[in-house]
């Protein structure tokens, strides 16, 4: 396998100010705080008002540029993972290029749709492209306006999701210890379990069964590819779907739950934004370089795991 030595130069995140609590849901649905919390671990979620996935992606990208005073003129690749763009074309990535004032540059910009696995997919694509030598700096974003595609009368799905965006700037590293490893995949025979038509639909029990099976498997597979053990990993950043799922994965792997970073109590499931958002949130408070596993799953089904130094 070709080595992919990359470094995360900077990260950024954005969530709308407007917060919807479980008690707020109890006023519009047959539910309550205890019911939601015990089943999901979610207490609050941020809901965009007058903003789209494009706006949130831009704000997260700008934070990533500003956090390290990064020279945005170096960026020559932009990849956005999202399932909630308000427009079919141009891509969110293309619009971020414009908002960053990079219109004069020869930049490759495109979106991908891999649902909640999207950011991990996008990082592997970016790593491969910059490692080819044809690109020098990749801006990778996960941005989701999930509230725009929810059925607000369906308590099984409406309570789960929030809006947010997370971004990372990636460059090639000259340190061989910065090799990145990936184990991504998909299957097409379960497309009727989690889908959007035109609102989010989900067979919750089947999604849970898939998630608790594929996430430990993905972690083990990516560790195997890297020639590492779980003891070589400082922490795991899982997709923030549901506390019970993460708890089950930790139990399956015989790991303390503290090894898994979480913020779903505050933000809920933000799909492709959840992993980069949590990555930036953690790095803000812990700037020292750590070796992490990113792991997620999503509609399709899709799944992805990555080992990175961040």
UniProtKB/Swiss-Prot annotation:
Enzyme group, top EC level?
transferase
Q: Name one Pfam family in it.
A: ACP_syn_III
On whether Manganese is a keyword of this UniProt record, the answer is no
Q: Does the keyword Transferase apply?
A: yes
Q: Report any one BP term from Gene Ontology.
A: fatty acid biosynthetic process
- Its pathway? Lipid metabolism; fatty acid biosynthesis
Name the residues annotated as catalytic in the UniProt entry.
116, 239, 269
Which terms in the GO cellular component ontology are assigned? cytoplasm
This enzyme catalyses: malonyl-[ACP] + acetyl-CoA + H(+) = 3-oxobutanoyl-[ACP] + CO2 + CoA
The UniProt GO MF terms for this protein read: 3-oxoacyl-[acyl-carrier-protein] synthase activity; beta-ketoacyl-acyl-carrier-protein synthase III activity
Q: What is its EC number?
A: 2.3.1.180
Which superkingdom is the protein from? Bacteria
Give a short account of what the protein does. Answer: Catalyzes the condensation reaction of fatty acid synthesis by the addition to an acyl acceptor of two carbons from malonyl-ACP. Catalyzes the first condensation reaction which initiates fatty acid synthesis and may therefore play a role in governing the total rate of fatty acid production. Possesses both acetoacetyl-ACP synthase and acetyl transacylase activities. Its substrate specificity determines the biosynthesis of branched-chain and/or straight-chain of fatty acids.
- Subunit composition and interactions: Homodimer.
**What protein name does the entry list?**
Beta-ketoacyl-[acyl-carrier-protein] synthase III
What is the organism field in this record?
Answer: Acholeplasma laidlawii (strain PG-8A)
**Gene assigned in the entry:** fabH
